[in-house]
Amino acid sequence: VNANVIKDEILALKEQGSTIIFSTHRMESVEELCENIALIHKSNKLIEGKIGDVKRQFRTNSFEVGILTNNVEGLMYDITQKFTVSPASFKSLNDDLKLNIQIGNAAPNELLNVLTQRGQVTHFVEKIPSINDIFIQTVTENKI
């Protein structure tokens, strides 16, 4: 309850145009409350910018896909010719094939075209990294 009261107060101050400096290790709070961020690790600023811009910078062009198909082999042949594919696990109401597909420099519509020719798409979501994922990746890559 106290965390919600604080969160509501921060959001109210933000709505009034106040600048709030927020220091936390809880990255889910950062995503919920902040517009601009600076990720600091061991006194080094690793990333700075608007949350959306930071996430765009770290996007991987990966999609979580669910598809109902009568021809799994044909579908897999078609998509592996153009894209990198791995199994996915997500909740679904269907007994669909679940895949993670990395499209590289291709447009999402190219993937959708291949999928819709081979079955009924039941799930299509871009996998956007969380701020926590970005922080871990950045710290690991910089070995700081």
Regions found by a protein language model. Name each.
Residues 1, 33-36, 57, 114, ...:
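Residue-level signal for well-ordered alpha-helical positions
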Residues 9-102:
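ABC transporter nucleotide-binding domain
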Residues 2-5, 9:
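Short alpha-helix in the ABC/ABC-like ATPase nucleotide-binding domain
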Residues 100-144:
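C-terminal coupling/interaction segments
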Residues 7, 55, 132-136:
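Conserved protein kinase catalytic domain
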